Amino acid sequence: MKNKFLLFTFVASICTTNMIAGNISDTIVPTKHNKQFTIGELAEIQPGLGSIMREFGHRFYIAYYAAKANNWDLAKYQINEILEAQEIVEVTRPKYAKQLKSFENSSIKKLQNSIEKKDWKLFKQKYNETTNACNACHTVNGHPYIKYQLPKKEPKYLRMSL
């Protein structure tokens, strides 16, 4: 995630430098793989909100079962990764930035607090509140048919307990 942010910062600085020169979307950005992209090409391949929300949901799911298994470090890691993904959305989909920041302040921070306290009962309560906030946000944004629900079993590919 941080590499994506650094790339975005690099691209933004090139854009600022080249604004005077002409069409920004034609500015070429080199990669570490000896490939070159134009700013326009990079803009076209940015993930949509649905792709990032899928990551949100998956990490949210892992956080629940990690906390349930008292693996508070894994739960904390997953929530922090959600926030990093949120930063990408705030940059690439700025119309959602205010709403996401509000969600972070009203829900995610309370969830993080329950993780810091290592309090399963509090975590479960805040997790359910956060789930309700997610589903309400989907409705407000015209997607009432998207309802997150916690899978009944923990992921088999990742050990939850320490």
Q: PLM ranges: what are they?
A:
Residues 130-141:
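The canonical Cys-X-X-Cys-His
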Residues 74-76, 82, 123:
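Solenoid-repeat scaffolds in large eukaryotic assemblies
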Residues 5-14:
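Sec-dependent N-terminal signal peptides
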